[in-house]
Amino acid sequence: MRVGVVCPYSFDTPGGVQNHVLGLAAHLRTQGHDPFILAPGDLDDADPWQAQFRSSFTSAGSAIAVPYNGSVARVNFGPLSAARVRRWLRQGDFDLVHIHEPITPSIAVLALWASEAPVVATFHTATPRSRTMQLAGGTMRASIE
């Protein structure tokens, strides 16, 4: 299967979700699937773990730092990002799209809205009291169901 994997967080900054995405892509390869990653930032070619994904990685562009949930998320969003997401989805012709943090205002939600392939989503955080999520919850409910 051709699997599109969307990471909302920039690969220019190390993080748990980014590492999870790479681990998932590596596992999918061992199972005979073809994973393709879309994320802001770029891989570190000096890091052999990241460099092995060079041919299947597409950068969604540079990211901006956004304070969120006691941390700083480096994400991108907007018309240029939306065009990159749509192009990646169209060119990828994926059998399945796996979106990490699908309601984060980032390329993740853009991919959720634009994908015509079946979508699997992974939520890495639980923020039931987040005002942002409470406000977005009603708007996003149809997209995540």
Descriptions of predicted regions:
Residues 85-106:
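Short N-terminal targeting/anchoring amphipathic segment
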Residues 88-90, 111, 142-144:
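Structural alpha-helical scaffold elements that stabilize or flank donor/cofactor-binding regions
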Residues 127, 133-145:
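Membrane-proximal helix-turn-helix segments that form the acceptor-binding/catalytic region
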Residues 7-14, 26-79:
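N-terminal strand-loop element at the rim of the active site
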Residues 8, 100-101, 123-127:
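Histidine-centered beta-alpha loop that forms part of the nucleotide-sugar donor binding/catalytic region
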Residues 1-3:
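Extreme N-terminal starter segment of soluble prokaryotic enzymes
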Residues 16-27, 107:
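Conserved alpha-helical elements of sugar-nucleotide-dependent glycosyltransferases
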Residues 116-118:
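A short helix->loop->beta-strand "cap" motif at the edges of active sites that frequently abuts
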